[in-house]
Swiss-Prot record:
It comes from Arabidopsis thaliana (Mouse-ear cress). Gene3D superfamilies: 1.20.1280.50. Residues 78-124 form the F-box domain. It comes from the Eukaryota. The lineage of its organism: Eukaryota, Viridiplantae, Streptophyta, Embryophyta, Tracheophyta. Residues 1-44 are annotated as: Disordered. Residues 1-14 have a biased composition (Basic and acidic residues). This is Probable F-box protein At5g36000.
Length: 355
């Protein structure tokens, strides 16, 4: 029977001819599989088929395959994250100062909306003034922040010709509507209970004033020229502890000059004064403020030969102290400003001038 060469080639494809010996020592050829060859006991070659237990049980063993899960790409990340998350940027603004907030608002309309939020500026104002609480205000907090940190002081609006220099002391809170003013920080504070303001000053060098506008107050220390003469050759100076309600500079009555300072009392010490002092306390928190270290002069007034003005501020009080050279005495004046004729007191000044 004839077969085609292709069929014959298919039958022997994958096989090899291996020589084996017969019983007479001759050789004969045997076809065996080329993929697995081993010798039997007679020295002949035979095929060994290896199967797994799963194959024997009819199971198909799956091979190793590549990962087919979707891979993340850069566009995928960008599509899932939005740079314009209001909560994130509102939180970021808590760490920005006023200038940085203005720059952020100038970026585009979306950031402008975030940066102009009143709560953002309220937080920035309380943080930078270092006061723990706030009170109801009539102005926006961005305007309040600007008036507090734009370098303005009370003598920038009025009496510019008398002004020499100034120093920002900080901010504190007056919330009891009654303040205790004193020019003496030595010894224990004594609160007068009777008499007019002038009588209180003459007897103890301190007084009580009522109808204080509650809220945050800003304190500055001002250095002025002699108020008694207009001579350019006069070297006399006057020190003033100048405190104001945080919204004073935004009030129309102050800006147009209709609100003015009134002298409420004065006290003259006609002997050598070692220092010029002035302090303002919230009466309700007087005991707490006294124990905060204000009366411990050694802790904040410097060395005995240090004549530079020193100041200390507490949550509900402020005080200044300047050592003086030998002198003939000192004149202390107390001024207040009201918000209109019958309004609350919105500013207080304690001034010291050598006689």
């Amino acid at each position: 029977m004839n077969t085609r060469s292709g069929d014959a080639e298919g039958d022997i494809r994958g096989k090899m001819i291996a020589p084996v010996r017969d019983g007479n020592g001759g050789q004969k050829r045997k076809l065996v599989q080329s993929n697995d060859i081993q010798r039997d006991e007679d020295g002949g070659a035979k095929r060994r088929i290896i199967q797994s237990s799963d194959q024997k049980n009819g199971k198909i063993l799956r091979g190793i395959h590549g990962c087919v899960s979707p891979r993340c790409s850069a566009p995928t990340y960008q599509s899932r994250f939005s740079w314009y998350e209001q909560d994130i940027w509102t939180y970021i603004t808590r760490f920005l100062d006023g200038k940085s907030l203005v720059k952020l608002g100038a970026t585009n309309k979306w950031f402008y909306k975030i940066a102009m939020e009143d709560t953002v500026w309220r937080f920035a104002c309380l943080r930078d003034l270092q006061v723990p609480e706030t009170f109801p205000v009539s102005s926006t907090w961005i305007k309040i922040y600007a008036s507090a940190f734009d370098g303005s002081h009370s003598y920038l609006f009025h009496q510019k010709e008398k002004h020499i220099d100034w120093m920002r002391l900080g901010a504190f809170v007056l919330d009891s509507r009654t303040s205790f003013l004193t020019e003496s920080l030595s010894g224990r504070l004594k609160v007068p209970t009777e008499g007019t303001i002038e009588q209180m000053l003459q007897s103890s060098g301190s007084c009580l004033i009522n109808d204080i506008k509650s809220g945050i107050w800003i304190a500055d220390l001002q250095l002025l020229r002699c108020p008694l003469c207009d001579l350019s050759t006069c070297d006399g100076t006057m020190q003033t502890l100048d405190v104001r309600h945080i919204e004073l500079f935004l009030s129309e009555g102050y800006k147009d000059g209709s609100w003015d300072y009134n002298l409420i009392g004065s006290h003259k010490l006609e002997k050598d004064a070692s220092a010029a002092c002035g302090a303002i306390f919230d009466l309700k928190h007087l005991k707490k403020s006294s124990s905060s270290g204000i009366l411990n002069l050694k802790s904040w007034t410097g060395e005995a030969d240090d004549s530079q003005p020193k100041a200390v501020i507490a949550p509900h009080a402020v005080a200044v102290h300047t050592r003086l050279q030998q002198n003939e005495g000192i004149l202390v004046k107390y001024h207040t400003m009201k918000a209109g004729t019958d309004g609350d007191i919105v500013s207080i000044r304690i001034s010291q001038q050598l006689l």
